[in-house]
């Protein structure tokens, strides 16, 4: 009497069955070194906030595109975006970055000119955001001060400034922070951020 053949497990191939046991991948970072290369939680959180803000800027830009085509944008959506942008990033996000930048200058005096530029950019972005929010409110209400050209220019100025600013932070300042700040610096920055939240 012959024994019944067992069918191979579905989805497996000869190569999969003969693969070596799982172990560290070639080029994988050992666990002991992984923490040294991973961004600190603060940088990760700031990056997540930037990604969310970038999505909102895309939404805003689509509405401005309608204005460029002489169509009526969704003023309520634009207002919602800018209400958020002038409440959360301006009041909570930028002050957290300022704490990181302050520590960078303490560790690397050569970064001071760039940090001053970024701190001034925070002030400028806040002003541009308020100007844009006002222009959107006029459009929403349809009042005599509503001017699509003013709104379009204000939106382009705000979107362009904020995108450039976030790019500088991602490409230069966040990597520099990871390079020069110590573990104790990150703990201090984190503790000082708590009241902001």
Identify the function of each model-found stretch.
Residues 2-197:
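Small-residue-biased structural context
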């Amino acid at each position: 009497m012959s024994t019944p053949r067992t069918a191979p497990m579905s989805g497996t191939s000869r190569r999969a069955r003969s693969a070596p046991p799982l172990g560290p991948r070639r080029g994988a970072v050992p666990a002991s070194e992984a923490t040294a290369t991973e961004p600190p939680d603060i940088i990760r959180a700031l990056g997540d906030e930037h990604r969310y803000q970038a999505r909102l800027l895309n939404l805003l830009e689509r509405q401005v595109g309608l204005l460029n085509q002489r169509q009526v944008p969704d003023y309520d959506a634009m207002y919602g975006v800018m209400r958020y942008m002038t409440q959360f990033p301006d009041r909570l996000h930028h002050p957290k970055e300022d704490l990181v930048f302050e520590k960078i200058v303490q560790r690397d005096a050569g970064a001071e000119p760039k940090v001053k530029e970024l701190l001034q950019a925070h002030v400028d972005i806040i002003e541009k955001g308020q100007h844009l929010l006002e222009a959107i409110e006029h459009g929403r209400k349809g009042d005599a001060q509503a001017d699509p050209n003013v709104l379009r220019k204000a939106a382009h100025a705000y979107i362009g400034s904020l995108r450039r600013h976030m790019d500088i932070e991602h490409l230069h300042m966040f990597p520099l922070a990871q390079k020069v700040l110590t573990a104790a610096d990150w703990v201090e920055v984190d503790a000082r951020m708590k009241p902001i939240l």
